[in-house]
Structures are given as C-alpha cells and as structure tokens.
Amino acid sequence: MTDKKDTIFQNPGPAEDFEFNSRVVEVFDDMLDRSVPFYKEVIQASAQLLQRHLKENDSVYDLGSSTGTTLLELSRVLKRQDISYVGIDASKPMLEKARLKAELYSKGDQFSFLEEDITQFCHQEAGAVILHYTLQFIRPMQREEVMRRIYASLRPGGVLLLSEKTISHQKELNRDFISIYHHFKKDRGYSELEIAQKREALENVLIPFSQNENKNLLKKVGFECVESYFQWFNFSSFMAIKPQP
C-alpha cells in the first residue's frame, strides 16, 4: 500500500483547527513518519516491553489506533498467535484504512477495529493498553477520567504504554526543544510555511503536559510502577503497571 505525501499545509491561508478527517487519513502515515521523532523506534521499544509482560490469550488495545500501524507492527514483532489486537478510534476513514491494511497483511482474524469514543473506554481484563500521542488531543479536564477508565480496564499486572509530546516548564529549555523539533521537521522536507501553519492549526487542539504532570496523573489513578522508557527532547514515552492484588 503506497501512502501519499503530506502536503496539507503547503498553501498559505488561514489555518483551521486540526482534525482527523479523510484528507488527513490519506497522508497520515507519511505525516507520522515525518512529524513524530523515532516513531518506529518507540513501537519497537513498546513491543519489547509487551513481550515481557503479556500473558497467554491477552488482548492489546490501541486507543486512537488511526490507520493501525502500531498494532500491525506490534504483531509483526511479537509473533504471538494467541494475542488479540483491538484498535479503537472515532474516525471512520481511519478505521476503514486500518481494516484494509490488516486484510492486506493477512491479519484480519487477529485484529478488530472499533468505532468508539476513547473517553468512554470500558473494556475489561486488558493485558495492555496503548495510548501513543493520543492523550494530548483530549481536553485536560477529561484526562483523569480517561486514565481511571483505562486503569479499571486492565487486569492486575496489565500495562499501559503512553507516549506524548511534552512541555518543559523551564521556558528557555522549552524554547530550545521547540527549536530542535522545528529543525527536525525541516530536515524531513517540511517548509517553514507548513511548519508554521500546522503549529497554528494544532494550537488549541494539542495541549501537552510536562513529564511530571503525566507521571503524576498515572500515579493519581492507581498505577504504582511508572517509568519513562523513551525520550527525545519534548517527546516522551511512559510505562505504567497495574499492581497485583
């Protein structure tokens, strides 16, 4: 399957709030590859952690599963026929592309993609929940409730893998991180106009927490073991384990 190049913000004009519509879906995989530092490496690291924590016949849920890339790559690395993979997203175009990709890779029997509001997540006895670069799009006042739902959904010993764009409350350092990320995107072919217009479109949509704010949120809802497992400047990944009784 050939993915189209992300050219959404190439033309000057007033930027509308970013949304996961059909236009974004067409270029989403390219957008991720060029906009999220070490995206593939984070999935690889996630797979290594899951390999050590998943039990027989566990289910893995990906909230905000988009085009299914994360789950498909996890299944390729894990090579576990007993694991069920469930992608949840509110975007019909995203789900349609995810289902098509799963069929193309002959993964249809092991995968399901559900159209649901992840803020109402209520599945039970999950072995793992993945939340990569998704929580940042949920309104801050709703995040604690979402985390409580995820915590309740996990079996004892189940894991949450969370990746987020983060903010530093040290203003000078935060400016440095933003500048480095700006150059990262330029190196991957985005123009100054594209970078500026996307930043404006995301301004009131993507609201990052700091590393400590994310960790404290996880601990507040009941997770006892919370650790960072990947960081690139203002992008961070966390693992949280639900305690055994």
UniProtKB/Swiss-Prot annotation:
HAMAP family: Cx_SAM_synthase (MF_01589). This is Carboxy-S-adenosyl-L-methionine synthase. Belongs to the class I-like SAM-binding methyltransferase superfamily. Cx-SAM synthase family. Catalyzes the conversion of S-adenosyl-L-methionine (SAM) to carboxy-S-adenosyl-L-methionine (Cx-SAM). Its EC number is 2.1.3.-. PANTHER family: CARBOXY-S-ADENOSYL-L-METHIONINE SYNTHASE (PTHR43861:SF2), TRANS-ACONITATE 2-METHYLTRANSFERASE-RELATED (PTHR43861). Homodimer.
